[in-house]
UniProtKB/Swiss-Prot annotation:
Protein encoded by which gene: bioB
EC number: 2.8.1.6
Residues at which [4Fe-4S] cluster binds: C85, C89, C92
Protein name per UniProt: Biotin synthase
This protein's pathway: Cofactor biosynthesis; biotin biosynthesis; biotin from 7,8-diaminononanoate: step 2/2
Domain Radical SAM core as annotated: residue spans: 70-295
Protein keywords: 2Fe-2S, 4Fe-4S, Biotin biosynthesis, Iron, Iron-sulfur, Metal-binding, S-adenosyl-L-methionine, Transferase
Organism: Mycobacterium marinum (strain ATCC BAA-535 / M)
Catalytic activity: (4R,5S)-dethiobiotin + (sulfur carrier)-SH + 2 reduced [2Fe-2S]-[ferredoxin] + 2 S-adenosyl-L-methionine = (sulfur carrier)-H + biotin + 2 5'-deoxyadenosine + 2 L-methionine + 2 oxidized [2Fe-2S]-[ferredoxin]
Residue spans crossing the bilayer: none
Length: 349
């Protein structure tokens, strides 16, 4: 056994036998066999010392390259309906229950189409229409249908949606509209969810996701790291996602919003955030892992490069729903510098 494979572990048994090093285990289990780490193994990765971060990121990158390939999928998002949401997601400035500065507003169809055009020009293959709602009503679904039709008439791009929790009938309607992928985040570990949301349950979200998959749409499901969860709960969340097995996992990092219950939380340290990126890649070797909201404030420009070389293989370009993102040009230049090709539209269809 190599030196790397026999590093001391806090989990050594009472007989004094040293446990195998978790990254050596991951190299065999994940890199060679494509089997994701389980919850306990992910926790061991999250507990690694800072001096092993680069080793972790290098392994996560190797896993991503072997099981996902070099291509990076680029996506843009737009808010069709902003603010006024009746739910109490403690991280979200769009809740109508908090004293945040975001106010309710709707986007018109011509503006939606123009946003899709600009997104496609950036090289993106996915354009996600988002609404701040518990779930869509008839008016919203009608607006979404009109928007999708208008986009398809003028723009060559996949259309995704994120419209909250759905009924079985609404799932079928969206599938019939040609929605390529549906985003609905579990947000955090099942055991921590009630600390984040109280107006609906984790199980309700899970039910929507299973119906989406059954209807033939791709499933996009991730969450936000740095909302006060423990490392154990972060590992649990990775295991929850592995059980769901979505097509895409967007990783957000809390960007505390004024007026929300989480507005005074500390931003996740960059090293801890990158360690989570590597750990989630080792838990989900074949899944599209997307850099999403909060990466700018958490990681900065250097962190974007380290994440893409540490397991990430998809990005959201431009701005987010209520916060500013990196300019699309900055991300595209970075990908070009790293010689990472953009995923082509025909490979996404």
């Amino acid at each position: 056994m190599t030196q790397a494979a026999t590093r001391p572990s806090n989990d050594a048994g009472q007989d004094g036998v040293t446990e195998p090093d978790i990254l050596a285990v991951a190299r065999q289990q994940v890199l060679e066999r494509g089997e994701g780490l389980n919850q306990e193994q992910v926790l061991q990765v999250l507990q690694l010392s800072e001096d092993r971060l680069e080793e972790l990121l290098a392994l996560a990158h190797d896993v991503r390259m072997r099981w996902c390939g070099p291509e990076v999928e680029v996506e843009g998002i737009i808010s069709l309906k902003t603010g006024g949401c009746p739910e109490d997601c403690h991280f979200c400035s769009q809740s109508g229950l908090f004293s945040s500065p975001v106010r309710s507003a709707w986007l018109d169809i011509p503006s939606l189409v123009e946003a899709a055009k600009q997104t496609a020009k950036s090289g993106a293959t996915e354009f996600c229409i988002v609404a701040a709602v518990r779930g869509p009503d008839a008016r919203l679904l009608s607006q979404v249908a009109a928007g999708i039709e208008a986009i398809r008439n003028e723009v060559e791009i996949n259309v995704a949606c994120s419209l909250g929790m759905l009924t079985a009938e609404q799932v079928e309607q969206l599938a019939a509209m040609g929605v390529h992928r549906y985003n609905h985040n579990l947000e955090t570990a099942r055991s921590y969810f009630t600390n984040v949301v109280t107006t609906h349950t984790w199980e309700e979200r899970w039910q929507t996701l299973t119906m989406v998959r059954d209807a033939g749409m791709e499933v996009c499901c991730g969450g936000i790291l740095g909302m006060g969860e423990t490392l154990e709960q972060r590992a649990e969340f990775a295991a929850n996602l592995a059980e769901l097995d979505p097509d895409e996992v967007p990783l957000n990092f809390l960007n505390p919003r004024p007026g929300t219950p989480f507005g005074d939380l500390e931003v996740l340290p960059a090293g801890e955030a990158l360690k989570a990126v590597g750990a989630f890649r080792l838990a989900l070797p074949r899944t599209m892992l997307r850099f999403a909201g909060g990466r700018e404030i958490t990681l900065g420009d250097l962190g974007a490069k380290r994440g893409i070389l540490g397991g990430i293989n998809a990005v959201i370009v431009g701005n987010y729903l209520t916060t500013l993102g990196r300019p699309a040009e900055a991300d595209l230049e970075l990908l070009e510098d790293l010689q990472m090709p953009l995923k082509a539209l025909n490979a996404s269809l």
